[in-house]
C-alpha cells in the first residue's frame, strides 16, 4: 500500500544513539576513544603480521584480512556518528546513505566469510596436521579471501540495486545511527516484497551458512581433541582455537540476539544497541582477544619492542 505525501527524498535524518542531550559529550569521548583504539589495535595486528616472519602462516594471513575488515566496518559508521554528535547535524545525503548501507553490508558479510575461512584453517591444522602445509597452500588462502570478497560484494550490490529502485515518502527519519537496510525499507512507499524476499533468503544464507560451517568445523575439532592421546595435545589445540572461538562467539552471539530472539516493545533501541556491539565493540575487542590469548602474537609484539629499543639506542 502506498503512503500519502510521497515525494523525492534527497536526504535522510539519522536519530543517532538513544541517549540524553546532556550525555552527548560523554558518549562522544567514549566512542572516539574506542574508535581510535580499534583502528590502532587492528593496525598493530596487521603490522606485526607483515613484519614478523614467524607470523607468515595461513591463520595469521586470514587474521590480517579480518583486522582490516574490522577497521573498515567501524569506519563506515562511527565517524559519521561522531560528526553528528559534535555538530548536531543528523542529515545524510541520499547517495551517502546508500553508499554507507552498501559498505556496511559488504564488510559485515566479509567478516562472516573470513571467520569461516579461519575455522576451516583450524580444522585442517588440528584434524589433519600432517597434511596441513599441503592443503593450506598460498593459492588456496588467496582463493578463499578472493571468494569472500566477491560473495560479499555481490550480496551488498544486490541489496543496493534493489533499494535504488524504491521510492521514499516524506518521512525521511531513520531511527538508527547509520543507514540500516531494514530501517530504510520501512520508509519506502514502494512494494518491498522483492527486497524482503532477498533479505530472508540470500541475506539469511550469508549469516547461517557460514555459522553452520564454523559449527561443523569445531564439531570435528572437538572430536579430535577428545581423542587426543595426551593432555598436552588437548591444551595445545584449545590454545590454538581459543582466540578464534572467542571472536566467533562474540560476533554471532550479537547477531543471534538481534535477528533470532523475540522482539520487545523497545525493538528499535535493541537494534541500535546490538548494532553498536558488532560495529564498535567487537572490532575493538578483537585485537585484545588475539594478543592476550595468542602466544605467537605476544611473541611478535615483544620482538617488535626489542627491535625498536635496539634501534633507539
UniProtKB/Swiss-Prot annotation:
One of its GO terms (biological process) is signal transduction. Signal peptide: none annotated. Its main location: membrane. SUPFAM superfamilies: Family A G protein-coupled receptor-like. GO terms for molecular function: G protein-coupled receptor activity; olfactory receptor activity. GO terms for cellular component: plasma membrane. InterPro entries: GPCR_Rhodpsn, GPCR_Rhodpsn_7TM, Olfact_rcpt. It comes from the Eukaryota. The chain crosses the membrane at residues 26-49, 58-79, 101-120, 140-158, 196-219, 237-259, 273-292. Glycans are attached at residue 5. Residues 1-25, 80-100, 159-195, 260-272 are extracellular. It is found in: Cell membrane. It is a multi-pass membrane protein. Keywords: Cell membrane, Disulfide bond, G-protein coupled receptor, Glycoprotein, Membrane, Olfaction, Receptor, Sensory transduction, Transducer, Transmembrane, Transmembrane helix. Disulfide bonds join 97-189. Residues 50-57, 121-139, 220-236, 293-313 are cytoplasmic. Belongs to the G-protein coupled receptor 1 family. Odorant receptor. This is Olfactory receptor 1J4. It comes from Homo sapiens (Human). The lineage of its organism: Eukaryota, Metazoa, Chordata, Craniata, Vertebrata. The gene is OR1J4.
Amino acid at each position: 500500500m502506498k503512503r500519502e505525501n510521497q515525494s523525492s527524498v534527497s536526504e535522510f535524518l539519522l536519530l543517532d544513539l538513544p541517549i540524553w542531550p546532556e550525555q552527548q559529550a560523554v558518549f562522544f569521548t567514549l566512542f572516539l576513544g574506542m574508535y581510535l583504539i580499534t583502528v590502532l589495535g587492528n593496525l598493530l595486528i596487521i603490522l606485526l603480521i607483515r613484519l614478523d616472519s614467524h607470523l607468515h602462516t595461513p591463520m595469521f594471513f586470514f587474521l590480517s584480512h579480518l583486522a582490516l575488515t574490522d577497521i573498515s566496518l567501524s569506519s563506515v559508521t562511527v565517524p559519521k556518528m561522531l560528526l553528528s554528535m559534535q555538530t548536531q547535524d543528523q542529515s545524510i545525503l541520499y547517495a551517502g546513505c546508500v553508499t554507507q548501507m552498501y559498505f556496511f553490508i559488504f564488510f559485515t558479510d566479509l567478516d562472516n566469510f573470513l571467520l569461516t575461512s579461519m575455522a576451516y584453517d583450524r580444522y585442517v591444522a588440528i584434524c589433519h596436521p600432517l597434511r596441513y602445509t599441503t592443503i593450506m597452500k598460498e593459492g588456496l588462502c588467496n582463493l578463499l579471501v578472493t571468494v569472500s570478497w566477491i560473495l560479499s560484494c555481490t550480496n551488498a550490490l544486490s541489496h543496493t540495486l534493489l533499494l535504488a529502485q524504491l521510492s521514499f515518502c516524506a518521512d525521511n527519519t531513520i531511527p538508527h545511527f547509520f543507514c540500516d537496510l531494514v530501517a530504510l525499507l520501512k520508509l519506502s512507499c514502494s512494494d518491498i516484497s522483492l527486497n524482503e524476499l532477498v533479505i530472508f533468503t540470500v541475506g539469511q544464507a550469508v549469516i547461517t551458512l557460514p555459522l553452520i560451517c564454523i559449527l561443523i568445523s569445531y564439531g570435528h575439532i572437538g572430536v579430535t581433541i577428545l581423542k587426543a592421546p595426551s593432555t598436552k595435545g588437548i591444551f595445545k589445540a584449545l590454545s590454538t582455537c581459543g582466540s578464534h572461538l572467542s571472536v566467533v562467539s562474540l560476533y554471532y552471539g550479537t547477531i543471534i540476539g538481534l535477528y533470532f530472539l523475540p522482539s520487545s516493545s523497545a525493538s528499535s533501541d535493541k537494534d541500535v544497541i546490538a548494532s553498536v556491539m558488532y560495529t564498535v565493540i567487537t572490532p575493538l575487542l578483537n585485537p585484545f582477544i588475539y594478543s592476550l590469548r595468542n602466544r605467537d602474537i605476544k611473541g611478535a609484539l615483544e620482538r617488535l619492542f626489542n627491535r625498536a629499543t635496539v634501534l633507539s639506542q
